[in-house]
């Protein structure tokens, strides 16, 4: 299941959905907006996306990881809009018979979302805006695996 939404993510509700099927392991990742970075305090982060294309790309990755790591269930939720420090940005939950598969799939999804998914992120600081670019180390992980 994938969602791209403005509202905050209800982590407990999403976790319950992962447990509906008989599984041996559940792995979650919750991305949180940071209060500051190396260049200063962050007032908020603004995330934009390409409606339709974003969902399509995330659905493709959900299908890929479900098959590759034999997942019983997979949930990917990413927010857009203005997000304040401390609020959740992204939720990834993977469920599988074995923990190794659930961990690998979850990590791959996060790396994919950071590098390949059509989201644009801008940090608003007191007197400046900073466009957030993907990191080369994350890009290398995706090239190796996908």
Question: What is each PLM-predicted segment?
Answer:
Residues 93-95:
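Short hydrophobic/aromatic beta-strand micro-patches
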Residues 1-88, 97-107, 111-146:
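N-terminal, polar/charged subdomain of small-to-medium soluble alpha/beta proteins
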């Amino acid at each position: 299941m994938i969602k791209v939404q403005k509202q905050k993510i209800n982590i407990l509700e999403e976790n319950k959905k992962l447990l509906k099927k008989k599984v041996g392991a559940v792995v979650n990742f919750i991305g949180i907006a940071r209060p500051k970075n190396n260049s200063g305090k962050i007032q908020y982060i603004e995330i934009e996306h390409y409606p339709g294309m974003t969902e399509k790309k995330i659905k493709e990755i959900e299908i890929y990881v479900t098959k590759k790591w034999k997942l019983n269930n997979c949930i990917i939720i990413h927010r857009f809009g203005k997000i304040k420090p401390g609020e959740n940005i992204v939720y990834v939950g993977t469920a599988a018979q074995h923990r190794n598969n659930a961990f690998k799939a979850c990590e791959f999804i996060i790396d994919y979302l950071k590098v390949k998914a059509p989201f644009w992120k801008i940090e608003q600081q007191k007197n400046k805006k900073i466009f957030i670019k993907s990191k080369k180390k994350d890009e290398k992980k995706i090239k190796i695996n996908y």
